[in-house]
Design a protein with these regions (language model features):
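Membrane-helix boundary connector in multi-pass membrane proteins
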Residues: 98-119, 139-140
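Cytosolic, membrane-interface loops and tails of multi-pass inner-membrane proteins
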Residues: 28-45
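Membrane-water interface of transmembrane alpha-helices
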Residues: 20-33, 97-104
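Hydrophobic alpha-helical membrane segments
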Residues: 85-104, 123-130
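Juxtamembrane helix-loop boundaries in multi-pass membrane proteins
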Residues: 41-56, 82-89, 112-126
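Hydrophobic transmembrane alpha-helical segments in integral membrane proteins
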Residues: 1-21
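Juxtamembrane boundary at the C-terminal end of a transmembrane helix
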Residues: 130-141
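Core segments of alpha-helical transmembrane spans in multipass integral membrane proteins
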Residues: 19-25, 46-71, 91-94
Length: 141
C-alpha cells in the first residue's frame, strides 16, 4: 500500500486529510445540534448542515474504496486512474477556502461574536494537503 502512495509521507497526508473530513462529517451529521450551537446557527439549518456533512461522507467512502476495496476487486493496481477524485477534492477544498475567505474578510454577511476563523483555516489546510497529494501522486494517476 505504501508504494502506491510514493512512500509513507503521502499515505500519512492522505490519512490525515480524510480524518479531518471524517471529523467534520461526524460533527455535521451526528452532532448537528452541538455544531450549530457552537457557531450560533439556528437549529432550522440542521438539514443544510447535514447536507454539507453528507458531502464529506461521500468523499470518505470514495477514499476508503480507493485505498482498501478497489485493490481487492481489481488486483494490485495501486492508484491508477483516481486522478479525477483527487482533483475534485482539491477543487472542493480550494473553493471552500476562497468562499470562506470572501465571507469572513470581504462580505462579512452573518459575522457575529461566534464567528470563527476555523472556516478559513481548515479549508486552507485541506487545500494544502490535497494539493500536496495531487502533486505527489501525479505520476501514479
Amino acid at each position: 500500500m505504501i508504494e502506491h502512495f510514493n512512500g509513507i509521507i503521502y499515505l500519512i497526508i492522505f490519512v490525515i486529510h480524510f480524518l479531518i473530513y471524517a471529523v467534520y462529517a461526524y460533527r455535521c451529521i451526528v452532532t448537528t445540534k452541538y455544531f450549530l450551537d457552537k457557531y450560533g446557527v439556528d437549529h432550522s439549518a440542521a438539514i443544510m448542515t447535514r447536507f454539507f456533512g453528507s458531502m464529506f461522507l461521500g468523499s470518505i467512502i470514495m477514499a476508503i474504496y480507493i485505498i482498501f476495496i478497489r485493490p481487492m476487486i481489481h488486483g494490485d493496481i495501486g492508484l491508477e486512474n483516481p486522478w479525477a477524485f483527487f482533483n475534485l477534492i482539491f477543487l472542493q477544498n480550494l473553493s471552500a477556502f476562497i468562499v470562506a475567505f470572501y465571507s469572513i474578510k470581504i462580505s462579512k454577511l452573518g459575522i457575529n461574536d461566534k464567528t470563527s476563523i476555523d472556516g478559513v483555516i481548515v479549508p486552507g489546510i485541506l487545500t494544502l494537503l490535497s494539493a500536496i497529494l495531487c502533486y505527489g501522486l501525479a505520476d501514479k494517476m
